[in-house]
A protein has these predicted regions:
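N-terminal amphipathic/basic leader segments beginning at the initiator methionine
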Residues: 1-17
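A short, well-ordered alpha-helical element
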Residues: 12-15, 31-56
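A general structural motif
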Residues: 21, 54-58, 86-90
Length: 124
């Protein structure tokens, strides 16, 4: 299985998923014209990854902003990760200390999913 990588643009986040280490990174802004189409290749890739995951899967989220349709796609990503059995899965949610919206979003996701989300402040 190959790694998954998409370069960041002004409207889409960087997506870097290393299958050999289980380290995943999503960073930047997520406001694509069509979130479902943008995230579809990643969701398909995750469907394959969860069949043979690493012993530990660590997903770092460092988003500056995301729109409502992107949040629905994030839930879909998290639902895929919930399907990983027999391996550790952790989501690290990074937010700037003065960004209450991103902090609240991370807290909201903690309520929705069955994966530990570790909240981490990025100090300015």
């Amino acid at each position: 299985m190959e790694n998954f990588f998409l370069e960041e643009t002004s409207k889409t986040p960087k997506l870097s998923f290393d299958v050999s280490t289980g380290k995943f990174l999503m960073s930047g802004r997520s406001i694509p014209e069509n979130s479902i189409e943008f995230y579809k290749p990643l969701l398909e890739w995750l469907d394959e990854y969860i069949k043979k995951p690493c012993a530990k899967t660590e997903f770092d989220i460092k988003l500056e902003y995301f729109n409502t349709s992107s949040s629905k796609c994030l839930v879909e990503i998290f639902r895929r990760l919930e399907k990983i059995k027999g391996a550790e899965v952790v989501i690290n949610w990074f937010y700037e200390e003065d960004d209450e919206d991103m902090q609240e979003s991370g807290e909201d996701f903690k309520e929705l999913i069955d994966i530990p989300i570790i909240m981490s402040v990025i100090e300015n």
